[in-house]
Structure formats: C-alpha cells, structure tokens
C-alpha cells in the first residue's frame, strides 16, 4: 500500500487538471492561417474539410466549381445553417476569386428552397452569416440575388467583380459594418 502525502496528492491533482485543460484547449483551437481548397468536382467541399474542422477555420480560399451543397457547408462555417439558425462557425475571411458557382447540389437555404444557378449569388446565399468579415466573390458572377447578404452584421469588406450587372433588393440590408 502506498503512503500518500498531502503534497504528493496535491501535485497529482494539479497534473490531472492541467492535462485535461490542455486537451480541451487543443480541441477548441481555431485555424487562423488561410486554408486553400482546390475542388476537382462541385459538391465535394464538405468531404475535403470534414466536420472536425468545419467550425474551426477562420480564413478560407476555394478554387474550382461550387454548387448548393458547397454553399450550404460554407454558410454553416460562416455562422448560419440552411434553416437560418446560428451555428458555431467562425469563418471570417472567404476568398472565392478562383471559384465558379454552378447549378446543382442541394438546397443551400431551406426557407424558400434556394438552389444555385450558374454565375449567380442567389437569394439569401449568405444571409445571416454573422461571422463573415471579408468576402471576395468569384470573378465571373453576373447577378446578386434578393437579400443575398442580409444580416451579415460583421461584414466590413466585399469585393464585387465588374461582371455584376444586377443586384437584388435588400441584398445588403443589415450589413451595418460594410465599409468597402
């Protein structure tokens, strides 16, 4: 039988507590460096990033074709799911300059059954994505839909390509931080 001293027992408890704290901190760490994802096929972003990193990435660049499935996943990463409910997403900076929006995939916003169309930022595409602070749109986007960025309260910078010829009503409603 071992003899325990108060000092020895105290040190064991301290090591156990500190060990569990560092494990918890590692699980909650954010990924702040830019992550670049090259999609060979639309609809594959969820499998490229996975659920373990989905809510930890804060800076993302996507190259390749993206569809409704990808946009739904991006929305979740940026703070809003397809129902418009808040998520744990922390995505602040999104660079889509090397991406192309294409038709297909699943619904990205359920309330009004929104699907993607070629070269269009659709209705409600980023609505409620309250983690987004900076967004660069694809260079070939021609249209921005109704309420596309509605309620993006932290969005400060949005890069629109010169190819945009129409912007829907209320597209930027509630974007109170937008400065450029």
Locations of regions flagged by a protein language model:
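Structural signature of tandem-repeat unit edges
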Residues: 32-40, 58-66, 89-119, 130-143, ...
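Bacterial N-terminal signal peptides
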Residues: 9-20
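Short, T/G/N/S-enriched strand-turn elements that build extracellular solenoid repeat scaffolds
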Residues: 43-53, 69-79
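Boundary at the C-terminal end of the N-terminal hydrophobic targeting segment
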Residues: 23-28
